[in-house]
Structures are given as structure tokens and as C-alpha cells.
Amino acid sequence: DSTNINFFNPSSYSRLSKGNTLMSLGLDSRFSFYEQAGVSEFKTSTMFDHFSLAFKATKRSGFAFGLKPYSNVGYEFSQSIFTGIDSVRYTYAGRGNLQDAYAGFAFAPISSSRSNLSFGANISYLFGFVSNERKSELLNAETNPGGLSLDLTRLSSFHYQLGAHFEHRIGKSNLILVGISIDPEQDFNGSLENSLYTSANIN
């Protein structure tokens, strides 16, 4: 589609409409419903999804760049368990996101009114962090002793993606279209921190 930015397949940039700069801005809204042991909870969240700009460079080529999500984490829930003497509350929470700042180019060696064959690539930089934690505490103890386990992942690495696109028109009303996007196996630079805290009162 020459009026939409398909940043999941970089070969599509060569099919953009000539003379127009396309911009895409997205927001992501999530509605979550949790229920356990008769207790229910409803949560909503809205976050930035993506921003992209794309334009036709020549008759056979196109460019695009922007910022898109690579991974998002956002949750929090808890449960209480009676141990026979006291109740222990476990709280699980995850937050953070990995962002993908990318620039892409596509070229079509075959471009006619009947057939089109295009190849493209995105070069991007991945960055961000994701944390997952588990917290426990005794509810009825005077000092509320407990503990906290925290896993923190940080990512800072380059990444690339390849794409191909072929279409051929048969008659006036039939079109064969095949697209492929390849995300090769790659090594990312990052770090993983595992921490365990114990205290008489963790807040």
C-alpha cells in the first residue's frame, strides 16, 4: 500500500507514493482484567507505540526512519497465602520497554505497471530496560519482615532486518503479492542483574 508505512517489511518503502512524505504516530492502550479467589481487578494503561517518517527517494527507491517498540512489559498483581501462623503476601511486578530506533532503505530492480520486485533493509539501534520483581511480606508480623527478588535486563545493541516484496498483476482485477521479512539470528549486547534483598521492612 503506497499510503501506509509498513516498517515490519522494509522492502515496502520503494512502493510509497511519489512526492508525499508519510508520517505515522501510534499509541497503545491496554485493558486488563484479573481475578483470583473471588477478588477481581481492572486496570488500563496507555503508552507510546511508534513514530515513523517515510518518503519516496527515486522512482525505484524509498527511505524510512523512526522509533518503534521491540518489547513492552507492564504488569502487577499480588496474592496472599495463609501459612497456618501468619499470612504471606506475594507481589509480582514487571515494567519497562525496549525501543527500536531504525532507518531503512528499499530498492526495486523491477518496477513496471504489471510487476514489481523490491528488496529492503532496516538498520536499527535497540535500547532500554525491563525489570521483573517478586516481593514477599508477612502481613500480621509487627515488623513486616519480607524479601525482594529483582531481575533487571538492560539492552544496548545494533540490529538489522531484511525484507523482500514481489507483486504481479494478472488482467485488470487479479494481483499476486508475496512478501517476506527476515530477522536473522543476532547477538545483542546487554546485561542481566539478579538481586536479592531481605529486610525487616521492605516498602
What are these regions (language model features)?
Residues 1-71:
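N-terminal, post-signal peptide beta-strand-biased segments of exported outer-membrane/organellar beta-barrel
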Residues 1, 60-203:
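Outer-membrane beta-barrel porins/channels
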